[in-house]
Amino acid sequence: MKWTDKQLDVINTRNRNILVSAAAGSGKTAVLVERIINMITDEESDVNIDELLVVTFTRAAASEMKERVRAALEEAIEKNPDNENIIKQLSLIHNADISTIDSFCAKIVRENFDKIDLDPNFRIADETEIKMIKADVIGEMLEDYYLEADEKFMSLAKQYSAGRLKDNIEELIEQLYKNACGHSDPEKWVKNCGNIYNIKTLEEFENSELLGEIVNFAKLELDGILEDLNTALKISMETDGPGCVDGLTQLMESISEIQKQNNYNKMRLAFRGVKSVTLRGAKGCDEAKKKQVQDIKKKAMDRLGKLESELFEQTVEEMAADIIKSHDSVSMIIKLTLDFMKRFADKKGEKGIMDFNDQAHFALKILLSEDEKGNVYPTDVARQMAENYKEIMIDEYQDSNYVQEDILNSVSKGQGVNNIFMVGDVKQSIYRFRQAEPGLFLHKYDTYSQDLTKDCCKIILDKNFRSRREVINSVNYIFNYIMTEKVGGINYKNGNGLTCGAKYDESINKQDNSTEIFMVEGEGREDEADFVAKKILEITDPENGLKITEEGQNKRRVKYSDITILLRSLKGVSDIYLQALEDNGIPAVADSKTGYYRTIEVRTVVSALSVIDNPYQDIPLATILISPMFSFTENELAVIKAENICEYLYDNLLLYKETGSDAEIKVKVKGFLDFLDDYRKRSVYIKVYELIEQLVNETGYDYYISSMPGGKRRHLNIEALKEKAVAYENISYKGVFNFIRYIEKLQYLDSDDGEAGISQENDNTVKIMSIHKSKGLQFPVVFLCDTNGGGRNDTDKIVVDDNGNIGVDMIDENLKVKSPTIVKRLIRRKNKQEDMAERLRILYVALTRAKEKLIITGVTKKLTKTISDLKESMYNVKDE
């Protein structure tokens, strides 16, 4: 393979702390594997494969990387069979530390459990088991607090407990705990969360960092407002523009005056000095441009007003008073969270289990210690591991968090010895919900030098070997203007765009491969999905459809299997697309993560288990009677029910067996009751997964569902249910009754795993998947659909930022009103900005999956207005 100069820099640079910013499609994995091979086979190198620590994001990636290294070594030994070093490396490949961070932590804990007095027989708990234990622990804890009737707790409960599970006090605890787990010392982090609420005087509040944060954040927001107004100014100055230069200039000067202030009170006063202006437009000007300028000005004033009302409405005295009043609520939330953390840890200890967070924190405890002054230093275990590893390689570094950073730093050489190699792409950091911290990548990106002689250096791989030039140009065009340091954390224009490295047959009509954006006028997703289906029929037409290039540069028409539909979320959306494709005769499969428990086959089998456990349940009993398992008709059930007046359907069946008037129905009832009696006896001594298997086989239900539309997936759904039953047995619960409770708990906790996936490698089928699932993959043709979705809602009753500040509501008991504290309003603003950055990165991932053709769709009820808005938003870029 011919490597680029930049790739060779990655492969050959040694004895440095290296950050590789590897853009989408830049051959990151191939380069990383080549670096490993180069290090362990270089005659001048003394590095063995088991002296490298290679950390990947997924098990599949770790397995693939180890296999690639093995294959490269085997190829090398074929060319040079007498090379003792290569033979040695092949023999050591089994001991190579190429794994996920979770597996690496597990290894540390299992090999050093005695250092932290841990039971060596622990097991990693099933995620569902952890959710169940967590819910039980919180429930028991809150019950204890309710019984104690502590005044501060009761006040908090009154404030936050109304509504659904996700809106009440339990969610507050879980949310704070989840954030804490992304930090190296969760308990310490939680304890410090309420520091801002510990103030007792106005002077303390004025000296806090909060007011400075508000001012700095407002300046960034004002930057954006001024940029929009500058766009309006440019339009006004055009030949046929509305000529509203004086009014816009006056408005911009007023806003600039706000931006100059470095003090909260002065900035608050400056806001009140802004006067709106009327932009009437010059006589004979272009009416469309006049409206465009007026709309921009209106939106700018709306943004300005919202910024003022959210962050500058209150005086310093009023804000301080709210903070002081909120102290008891915040301190109780922290107390509850710390109590939960202890009880949760104790419960896991009793059961001899841990979760992945525990594993990481136990590993950290083994590797790092703290002295009396709070200084952290590596333990003997960490120092020994650091001696063993010649280099640490971290793949997908943009998805690391603080805990992982501390773990890997603790086993690096440190102390002036540079041996950490990090590779990733911050533009593809899309796991903020898992506490990924892209700021770790960005800090190094900003501080590392491109001079490879420096101890800490960075190498940028910007050449994309995946996509056609048309796709690359589209991605660059979009992100040059929307991904900036303020929104996205990185300036895309400044050397972070893609360059085309892929070679495609340029004889294919270029127009076929240009990116297309369609805004569908319609009522909702159904209209958009139908449009997409018809577009797929168009591009797969055997005579006039789109042509793509296969390996070897052979041209052919697009097939269904070349096409992937990407969605931000599959929940409630993928079914609509599946139906639209089916209606248009297009075979499709969705990698769905929702709807599993709603599928008819799963509901039927779970109902059967419920009846086996307790037949006095009319709905599950009626469900299985009219199902293909037993094939009763609704009329037959009506006859059975009408003949005897009984409270329960099961009693009706028992009586009908003896006294029923219809001989045919009587035979069916007897057959069912005998069957049920047999299975109730079996359930006592066989495992639940065996019971499920016998049930679907002996009733012929498995054959029936396999013959239905989507039969393959339905069969796999039942197989997945059996797997859940196996997992249930493994976590020590027993019996049908507890399994039913287990399934109910899964549904209650919103742990719907989605329908079983189907391998479609050899099927000519359109694939539907989430953008997150598509990361790392590539497809000839990509439809990015349902692009109208908004960001996260601002409905959380408690918000937390990365610095450990908690934002809560302040309740006025006298007026019976609730309002967010200034801390909550600021955090909500910051979180919205971070959410926007995450959405940009998700968009980047989606667009860079396409190899040859990219199609983007959305739906709107008012097409004319949408087009007008798009024109306005694109004005800045039209001439560039």
Q: Model-predicted segments: where are they?
A:
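Conserved motor-region signature of P-loop NTPase helicases/translocases
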Residues: 1-67, 126-128, 136, 143, ...
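Accessory N-terminal region flanking or inserted into the helicase ATPase core
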Residues: 1-21, 31, 51-53, 121, ...
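Active-site-adjacent bridging/hinge elements
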Residues: 32, 107-113, 311-315, 333-338, ...
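Conserved ATP-driven helicase/translocase motor core recognized via long
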Residues: 51, 167-354, 455-456, 585-586, ...
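Core structural elements
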Residues: 93-106, 159-184, 333-339, 357-367, ...
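Helicase C-terminal subdomain and adjacent C-terminal extension
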Residues: 653-656, 672-674, 803-804, 820, ...
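Conserved catalytic motifs of ABC-family nucleotide-binding domains
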Residues: 792-833
